[in-house]
Design a protein with these regions (language model features):
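Short, charged alpha-helical interaction segments and adjacent helix-coil junctions
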Residues: 2-6, 78-83, 183-278
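Accessory alpha/beta interaction modules
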Residues: 1-161, 169-171
Length: 278
């Protein structure tokens, strides 16, 4: 039995994000989003999805599991992540993630000359990052390896793109670019009860058709509802803890759990936090 009232999935959930951007049948949606983000700086013609789970050089190393990991027709690597809540060392985590697509390019033997393909880390942030390096009124942040004095590019093989989608506040009639439209649906898809005229293009026709919950199988619906519940549970717990002025540690735990997609009530070792936020 369906319990979800919305017509379309939320792209902020783990299930919704990966269904739209991380599956082979929907790779055209990922390609369109990336091209709208890069706006001519990079033109992606095709993508191949790669294994999103990585481990280090030895079995004791920590795993890294990406939301979406793919390469384009030139062999350049893309990690695409949705980050729903602040994490203390999030920038360090992004840098750590970047080491995997860099290291896996190493060729065995003595013939490799260390030439690398470009690696892009694209992160969609569902909160205000409030980073001192960023302009407060800017949504897109483009980070690379630069000389501090000249501000010229030192090496162009590693790019971080942070997109603070929570700052996007255009109304539907104000959407001008394809990129505007993507940011709008990332924020608002699950709130819509029909496909607006402003979003009736070939790619968004595909998106709305794929995102319609009524078309899900029972298994897909169950998986989505679990993902949505996990998202709402942790969000509600986080908001409640912040309102009550609970400890930063408790709030940080809730935020970290949100990234793991875990319903808070199912974590016995977090019973104290859960009780605080009831």
């Amino acid at each position: 039995m369906r319990h979800t009232e919305e017509r379309y999935i939320s792209l902020l959930t783990d299930f919704g994000f990966k269904r739209i951007f991380g599956t082979k049948p929907n790779k055209d949606l990922l390609i369109d989003f990336l091209n709208s983000l890069f706006n001519g700086e990079q033109v992606v013609k095709d993508v191949t999805f790669l294994n999103s789970e990585h481990v280090g050089d030895v079995h004791t190393d920590r795993k890294a599991i990406f939301d979406v990991y793919c390469e384009n027709e030139k062999g350049e690597k893309f990690i695409v992540e949705m980050q729903n809540a602040y994490q203390t060392y999030f920038k360090d985590r992004s840098l750590y993630y970047a080491t995997f697509p860099i290291r896996e390019q190493a060729q065995k033997g003595e013939g490799w000359n260390y030439k690398l393909k470009h690696v892009y880390i694209v992160v969609l942030l569902n909160y205000d990052m409030s980073d001192p390096a960023f302009s407060d009124d800017t949504i897109n942040h483009d980070i690379g390896l630069l000389d501090k004095q000249t501000h010229r590019v030192f090496n162009d093989k590693l790019t971080f793109k942070y997109v603070e989608i929570s700052k996007f506040n255009k109304r539907i009639e104000e959407l001008k670019t394809n990129y505007d439209k993507w940011l709008f649906v990332l924020q608002n898809l699950s709130r819509l009860d029909c496909q607006p005229e402003y979003l009736k293009t070939a790619v968004f026709n595909r998106l709305f058709a794929e995102a319609e919950i009524a078309k899900f199988t029972r298994a897909e619906l169950r998986e989505y509802e679990d993902s949505l519940k996990a998202y709402r549970d942790i969000k509600n717990s986080l908001d409640s803890a912040e309102e009550k002025g609970e400890s930063k540690k408790a709030i940080e735990i809730a935020k970290n759990l949100l990234e793991m997609g875990m319903p808070i009530e199912k974590k016995s070792n977090l019973s104290k936090l859960y009780n605080l936020t009831k």
